[in-house]
């Protein structure tokens, strides 16, 4: 059973997050291992396994990138275990330049420049995310998979910039 079916939701990228949360809470209550404490060892094990599956499904579906990766996996694109990466050399060069810029900002300890950098990366991420949503809605899986790969780069860059921001603020 796929995660969308487990939560009683259609297998689409855009989903009702409130319904997802409510269904998660219902499933947690229904299959919590403590409810099976007086059951047989097999029932207890099954409850623990089912609870773990529910938690994994929840973590996967509630985060936009992992939800996109999971949806793509249902259509034959296993991005989580694939070995190849982005082949777009212009994009990769841009990522290298952005990483170098972030290193320069760190060396200079320039908070104002970092704030501008974070906004720029967020804008880039948001634009590419919107493109991914359209690609998933149109079921252009191969193109969406490439966009998700690029979003991973931007997400890591954004995370690095935010970590630097915390470091500079604590300094």
From Swiss-Prot:
User: What are its GO cellular component terms?
Assistant: iron-sulfur cluster transfer complex
Gene Ontology BP terms:
[2Fe-2S] cluster assembly; protein complex oligomerization; protein folding
**Keywords tagged on the record:** Chaperone
- Which is one Pfam family of this protein? HSCB_C
Instruction: List GO molecular-function terms, semicolon-separated.
Output: ATPase activator activity; protein-folding chaperone binding
InterPro entries, from UniProt?
DnaJ_domain (IPR001623), HscB (IPR004640), HscB_C_sf (IPR036386), HscB_oligo_C (IPR009073), J_dom_sf (IPR036869)
Q: Which Gene3D superfamilies match?
A: DnaJ domain, HscB, C-terminal domain
Give the source's domain of life in one word.
Bacteria
Q: Where is the J domain?
A: 2-74
Q: Which family does it belong to?
A: Belongs to the HscB family.
Assembly and oligomerization: Interacts with HscA and stimulates its ATPase activity. Interacts with IscU.
What is the protein name stated in its UniProt record? Answer: Co-chaperone protein HscB
**Source species of the chain:** Citrobacter koseri (strain ATCC BAA-895 / CDC 4225-83 / SGSC4696)
């Amino acid at each position: 059973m796929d995660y969308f079916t487990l939560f009683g939701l259609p297998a689409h990228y855009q989903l009702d997050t409130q319904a997802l949360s409510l269904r998660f809470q219902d499933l947690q209550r229904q299959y919590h291992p403590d409810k099976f404490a007086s059951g047989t060892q097999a029932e207890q094990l099954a409850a623990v396994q089912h609870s773990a599956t529910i938690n994994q499904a929840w973590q996967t579906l509630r985060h936009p990138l992992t939800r996109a990766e999971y949806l793509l996996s249902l259509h034959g694109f296993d991005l989580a275990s694939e070995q190849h990466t982005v082949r777009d050399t212009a994009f990769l060069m841009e990522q290298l330049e952005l990483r170098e810029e972030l290193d320069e900002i760190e060396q200079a300890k320039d908070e104002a420049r970092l704030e501008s950098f974070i906004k720029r990366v967020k804008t880039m991420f948001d634009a590419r995310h919107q493109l991914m949503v359209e690609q998933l809605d149109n079921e252009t899986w191969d193109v969406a998979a490439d966009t998700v790969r690029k979003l991973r780069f931007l997400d890591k860059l954004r995370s690095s910039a935010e970590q630097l921001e915390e470091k500079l603020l604590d300094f």
